[in-house]
Amino acid sequence: MPKRKSPENAEGKDGAKLTKQEPTRRSARLSAKPVPPKPEPKPRKTSAKKEPGTKINRAAKGKKEEKQEAGKEGTAPSANGDTKAEEVLSTNASH
């Protein structure tokens, strides 16, 4: 493959093509351009002050009560997912 001719050795119509800038490597092109400044982030608006945590506490209390009720009934599985021994005995006796 022939090497590119330098603009000094250009003759005739080839000289017009070589008047353009030679392509450079990508890293050289990117480093030549100044980095545009990043716009500063706008401060987020804070909502009106309410009693802190009232909504969270209500939800947490409701969930705790549901878990306690389910535990009282004896239908909820234990923490590790195993069934209780009483449930196993009752299912085997019915068969």
UniProtKB/Swiss-Prot annotation:
Biased composition (Basic and acidic residues): 1-25, 39-53, 62-72
Any Gene Ontology CC annotation: nucleus
GO biological process, one term: chromatin organization
Record's subcellular location: Nucleus
Gene name per UniProt: Hmgn3
Subunit structure, as described in the record: Interacts with the ligand binding domain of the thyroid receptor (TR) (in vitro). Requires the presence of thyroid hormone for its interaction. Interacts with transcriptional regulator SEHBP. Interacts with nucleosomes.
Keyword Iron recorded: no
Record GO terms (molecular function): chromatin binding; nucleosomal DNA binding
Domain of life: Eukaryota
Name of this chain's protein: High mobility group nucleosome-binding domain-containing protein 3
